[in-house]
Curated annotation (Swiss-Prot):
Membrane topology term: Single-pass type II membrane protein
InterPro entries according to UniProt: FKTN-rel, LicD/FKTN/FKRP_NTP_transf
Disrupted-gene phenotype: Decreases the mannosylphosphate content in cell wall mannans. Eliminates N-glycan mannosylphosphorylation, when its paralog MNN14 is also deleted.
Origin species: Saccharomyces cerevisiae (strain ATCC 204508 / S288c) (Baker's yeast)
Parts of the chain on the Lumenal side: 49-1178
Spans annotated as Disordered: 1041-1178
Biotech relevance: Mannosylphosphorylated glycans are found only in fungi, including yeast, and the elimination of mannosylphosphates from glycans is a prerequisite for yeast glycoengineering to produce human-compatible glycoproteins.
GO cellular component, one term: Golgi apparatus
High-level lineage: Eukaryota, Fungi, Dikarya, Ascomycota, Saccharomycotina
Protein name: Mannosyltransferase regulator 4
UniProt comment concerning the protein's domains: The conserved DXD motif is essential for the function, which could be an indication that MNN4 has transferase activity.
The keyword Cytoplasm is annotated on this UniProt entry: no
Length: 1178
């Protein structure tokens, strides 16, 4: 901070000074500037940041020797100035370990006082506990768990294996869940972990109490109102009754329900998982489920490198962690003087798990009690270059195995292990399971919302680590650790498995998985799958702690005797699950079944039918698929597992069974019946007309094996398996692996630049790059001014580019880029290495460096396998020396993921207390050093003086094992003596330089004039001498298939021509018919038109006549009407006149009458008046 302020003030003063033109004023300002510089320098030199670390980081510092650098580049002066600063040297060493150290060594020790009793999170963060009895929670650390458990096992004097107390809390990480456990005040309802996104009010209350975020994945989005509203409105459990099925509240011992009294648990128990929520919600839900509900493993299986396994039975009834079981206190009591460090007069205890592990494996009593020996396997099989399988490996008699186990249980009940009991129950259930009615066994977290679809690649129970999706280095480290541990585990126990599907395809290029793969696929014979289930199902597999910190739960399906697809709910037989993340390896078993073979096997089946003198139209039936299953089940009814789909339909629809509660409805079989009776007969497989019993007979006879997802392999494709290296550890692959891949994928024939899913494979790097990132690192288009451009692009070659046929469909629109990457010089390779960290792709550079030796090994293996200048026996001897002398030197191509997370957290803490500019300088120095190292490695590989391939033999005079007997051909094979000539004489030389042998695959396109690379992957390498004959057979088969295809195409073409000619003749005839018909129709139409015209004219004439007549009638009628109207008018007028006269007469009469009346009235009035007058006079 001070340095930034100083720089800012400098710029302001200087800019102000430059604007001042008055000379005397400048004279005043100059001393002021100098004074400012002196003050800032003094403050900086006395600040904690001056040394790069604050006081709080002192506890991180281990004792490291100073590192020297002979580099003469620009940073040498800076490096030398750092050498005397121990804290900065620690930062440099820590960063080197974090990015480029794959050796699983801890940078510090784990102790009671500094680690276990120091509270690292929650309301009491920073405080120190007095004893382990005060622990409310603690973070998982393998050093703690291993030390306590190993101490207990070694101090156990029992003569029988003891069942070890167990809690998931001690065997997987609960860091985020511990944050919930640590809180004392905030009370949470059950629905907190079942809403689509966290309730913000509860979340903020938790984080206020914690003093840190509850989770990291997309945490800032909760501050976005629109996003939060949308996230909260998604699906969630709203009904309280439904919620009770999933969750129940836990109360403290005092019964008050306060979280303060809870230890090693949250406030609720998750009883059933609900994954329709966001990842940060589901992570805590799933972790709680593991802690409170997930059943215990039956054992822990401890691997000693890849040599042996120790199996310790576990208590499965009640969960007890290291504190609750008393094992931790026992360890403290036994090791109270294990360290001389003291703090506040308290003795400290160190947890040195590696020392204890070495004592454990060297302890004879431990070996007698816990070392596992599987009589049915041969661990020495893996010492050979080739592993030969037997057809019996693909068969399994379930009924016989059940009888055998029940007899053991009866005779030796005390020695009958929990694994045997579990396996016996599983078999009993499996033999009663119909393929059409099986239930789904494995569940993924596929419904987790807004997680980029990654939930489908996580086991639903063990889903965890919300930041893993955003850290590619940690993600690849997780996958790397998982496959390495599985390979060491199977080798240590003699269990045979091999790489398959996409995992095998990834191996083909560089001996590692494709970077876009999220899991691994392995296959094994059904016999070894059953052994895996019997001895290790429900076991927690532990990696040798000296080699890594992997912990994996082996989960095997309960329907292993079901070997066909059925309803498709159980294509996977077993999973090897990372308990920290839920990532897994898919394991599938191969066996002879009644499944219809795939059409790519048609040619093989036709050849084998001829050899076996069989007719596809007359194949016998076999009950072998269900022969080992019981006919009846416990209720005395027919075992439906013995019925094929049509038999099952007939059984459940019969009158005597259709109402039985045990029998499903026929609607459950609708899709399967459609596949069997409608789709299969129309398919291209040669077996499309066979019933299930015929298919089983044929598949078993021809040694065709398949998994439950209908992936088929012939015995010859698989055996002998090739002992090779994958991710730096021994692994097996199918004998004809390239042939297998061609049947499943569109594998390019040539080893060269390749592209897929916006990634590009560069043979010079033996690495799959993100294409956009690669373009930036090569700067072909000169878009990035600070990154030098490679020189392989020549503008004068546009003509050549336009005429070049580019094999990569993805890059047809990017011919310039593809051409450039097919013409990389060594200078270009150096430049790309330098540009990768400069462009900011640190994870890419880390992966390139850490995997360099592993990918170089695969390159050398390919160079020897496909070299035409070496005889058969020379190849075999060289490959043997490569495997036994070079492979053991390979280190892991990625860092142990737990150590990576641990050191990443240390680096994060360091970054908070150390000046960022200094940190940037440290990382830049490290990058520059490792760029130089990888360029040196690349040059030595290019110029064939790579030290890894220099082998020094034992000079004691002992005969060197060259494994020659592994390649002795059968007596029936015709041998060419030249193939067994060898100029290699290891016994007379003490040194072998493998650099001198094989093809040059460093830059395969440069050695090809057409820039297409080296054609290799169109065929398999010669592994056994019989492969020469098989290669000829394969060529003959290809020739026949080609000829057959050509004949089919010719026939098809002739048929098309014939059809075309017939169609043309038909068309011509149709046109003639049409023309004739049109003429007839025309004539007919004309006649009809003429007739119509005549009829219209006649009709018109008739209408005119009629109209004329109607008009005459109308006129007559009008005259009559007029006359009538006139008469009526006249009559009306007369009547009106008459009426008028009558009214006039009447009026006159009325007037006359009125006049008379008035006169009469007047006369009367006069008379009355006269009378009155006469009366007055009287």
């Amino acid at each position: 901070m001070l340095q930034r302020i100083s720089s800012k003030l400098h710029r302001r003063f200087l800019s102000g000074l430059l604007r001042v033109k008055h000379y005397p004023l400048r004279r005043i300002l100059l001393p002021l500037i100098l004074l400012q510089i002196i003050i800032i320098t003094f403050i900086w030199s006395n600040s904690p940041q001056r040394n790069g670390l604050g006081r709080d980081a002192d506890y991180l510092l281990p004792n490291y020797n100073e590192l020297d650098s002979d580099d003469d580049s620009w940073y040498s002066i800076l490096t030398s100035s750092f050498k005397n600063d121990r804290k900065i040297q620690f930062a440099k060493t820590l960063y080197e370990n974090l990015k480029f150290g794959t050796n699983p060594k801890w940078v510090n020790e784990y102790t009671l006082q500094n680690d276990l009793l120091s509270v690292k999170m929650g309301p009491r963060k920073g405080s120190k506990l007095e004893s382990v009895d005060e622990l409310k929670f603690y973070d998982f650390d393998p050093r703690l768990t291993w030390s306590v458990v190993l101490n207990h096992l070694q101090n156990n004097d029992a003569d029988q294996p003891e069942k070890l107390p167990f809690s998931w809390y001690d065997w997987t990480t609960f860091h985020e869940l511990n944050k919930l456990i640590s809180i004392d005040k905030t009370v949470l309802p059950c629905n907190f972990l079942f809403q689509s996104a966290f309730d913000k009010e509860s979340l903020e209350a938790i984080e206020t109490e914690l003093g840190e975020p509850l989770f990291l994945y997309e945490r800032p989005k909760y501050a976005q109102k629109l996003w939060y509203k949308a996230a909260r409105n998604q699906d969630r459990i709203k009904d309280s009754k439904e919620l009770k099925k999933h969750c129940s509240k836990l109360f403290t011992p005092d019964g008050h329900g306060s979280p303060k009294g809870l230890r090693f648990n949250t406030q609720f128990q998750i009883k059933e998982l609900y994954d329709k929520v966001r990842p940060e919600v589901y992570q805590l839900q799933a972790r709680n489920y593991i802690l409170t509900t997930q059943s215990h493993p039956l054992s822990i299986s401890i691997i000693e490198s890849d040599n042996s396994t120790y199996q310790v039975p576990l208590q499965t009834e009640k969960s007890k962690n290291l504190v609750q079981s008393g094992l931790l206190q026992e360890y403290i009591n036994d090791n109270i003087n294990s360290t001389n460090k003291r703090k506040k007069n308290k003795q400290d205890v160190e947890f040195n798990h590696n020392r204890l592990f070495q004592e454990f494996v060297n302890n004879d009593q431990v070996n007698s009690l816990y070392k596992l020996e599987i009589e049915e396997t041969d661990k020495f099989t893996f010492d050979k270059d080739l592993v030969y399988l037997s057809p019996s490996d693909f068969k399994f008699d379930a009924s016989k195995k059940i009888e055998e186990l029940e007899e053991q249980k009866k005779l030796y009940p005390d020695k009958f292990s929990a694994h045997n009991e579990n396996y016996l129950n599983s078999l009993k259930n499996s033999v009663k399971t119909s393929p059409a009615l099986q239930r789904k066994f494995f569940y993924e977290a596929g419904a987790v919302k807004q997680y980029k679809g990654m939930g489908f690649h996580r086991d639903k129970r063990f889903f965890n680590v919300d930041t893993l999706i955003n850290d590619k280095q940690e993600y690849q480290a997780r996958l790397n650790s998982m496959i390495r541990t599985f390979q060491k585990f199977t080798k240590a126990n003699g269990i045979i498995s091999w790489l398959s599907h996409g995992t095998l395809y990834g191996y083909l290029y560089n001996g590692m998985a494709f970077p876009w793969d999220n899991d691994f696929d392995l296959q094994m014979p059904i016999k070894h799958l059953q052994l895996l289930s019997q001895y290790f199902n429900q076991s927690l597999i532990l990696e040798d702690p000296r080699q890594g910190n992997g912990r994996y739960f082996l989960d095997v399906s309960d329907s292993l005797t079901v070997r066909i697809n059925g309803n498709g709910k159980n294509n996977i037989d077993a999973r090897f699950i990372d308990v920290d993340t839920g990532l897994y390896i898919d394991i599938t078993g191969l066996a002879s079944t009644s499944a219809p073979s795939r059409d790519y096997l048609n040619s093989y089946i036709e050849e084998r039918l001829q050899e076996e003198h069989l007719d596809i139209n007359n194949i016998p039936e076999s009950n072998g698929e269900t022969a080992t299953l019981p006919d009846k089940v416990d209720d005395g009814l027919v075992n439906m597992a013995t019925l094929n789909i049509t038999e099952l339909r007939d059984y459940i629809t019969s009158d005597e069974n259709k109402n039985h509660k045990r029998v499903p409805t026929d609607t459950d079989l609708k899709d399967l019946l459609k596949k069997e009776l409608e789709e299969l007969p129309k398919s291209k497989t040669i077996e499309n007309k066979l019933n299930p019993k015929q298919r089983y007979f044929l598949n078993e006879k021809l040694k065709l094996y398949n998994c439950r997802n209908n992936h088929f392999n012939s015995f010859e494709e698989l055996s002998p398996l090739i002992n090779t290296v994958f991710h730096g550890v021994p692994a097996l692959i199918p004998h004809r692996h390239t042939y297998c891949l061609h049947n499943e994928y569109h594998v390019p024939d040539r080893y060269a630049f390749d592209a897929y899913k916006n990634t590009a494979y560069l043979p010079e790097f033996r690495f799959w790059f993100d294409y956009d990132g690669l373009k930036k690192c090569s700067n072909i288009n000169s878009w990035y001014p600070n990154i030098p451009s490679i020189n392989s692009w020549n503008p004068n070659l546009l003509k050549e580019i336009s005429s070049t046929k580019f094999e990569s469909k993805l890059f047809d629109s990017n011919k310039v880029s593809e051409y450039s990457f097919k013409n990389l010089s060594m200078d270009d390779v150096r430049l790309i290495y330098k540009n990768i960290p400069k462009a900011g792709f640190i994870e890419v550079f880390t992966n390139l460096y850490n995997s360099f030796n592993v990918t170089a090994y695969r390159q050398k293996e390919l160079e020897i396998q496909y070299c035409q200048n070496l005889t058969f026996i020379e190849k075999k001897k060289l490959l043997h020396q490569l495997r036994i002398n070079v492979a053991p030197k390979l280190s892991s191509p990625a860092k142990d993921p737990f150590l990576f997370g641990y050191e990443k957290a240390m680096w994060k803490d360091l970054s908070k207390s150390m000046n960022q500019t200094t940190l940037d300088q440290v990382t830049k120095i490290v990058h520059e050093e490792y760029v130089g190292k990888i360029i040196d490695l690349s040059e030595s590989l290019k110029y064939r003086n790579f030290s890894l391939f220099n082998i020094t033999f034992d000079e004691t005079g002992t005969t060197l094992d060259d494994n020659t007997e592994d390649y002795t051909p059968a007596n029936t094979v015709e041998v060419n003596p030249v193939d067994f000539k060898s100029n290699l004489n290891f016994s007379s030389n003490s040194f072998l330089d493998l650099n001198s042998y094989g093809l040059d695959l460093f830059a395969p396109t440069l050695s090809d004039v057409n820039r297409k690379g080296i054609q290799m992957f169109d065929k398999d390498p010669i592994i056994v001498y019989e492969d020469y004959a098989y290669a000829k057979l394969l060529e003959e088969r290809k020739r026949r298939e080609k000829k057959k295809k050509e004949e089919e195409e010719k026939k098809k073409k002739e048929e098309e021509e014939k059809k075309k000619k017939e169609e043309e003749e038909k068309k011509k005839k149709e046109e003639e018919e049409k023309k004739k018909k049109e003429e007839e129709e025309k004539k007919k139409k004309e006649e009809e038109e003429k007739k119509k015209q005549e009829e219209e004219e006649k009709k018109k004439k008739e209408e005119e006549e009629k109209k004329k007549q109607e008009e005459g009638e109308k006129m007559k009628n009008e005259d009559e009407e007029n006359k009538k109207n006139e008469d009526e008018e006249k009559k009306k007028n007369e009547e009106e006149e008459k009426k008028k006269q009558e009214e006039k007469n009447k009026k006159n009469e009325d007037e006359e009458k009125k006049k008379q009346e008035e006169e009469e009235k007047k006369k009367n009035e006069e008379e009355e008046k006269k009378k009155q007058e006469e009366g007055h006079s009287n």
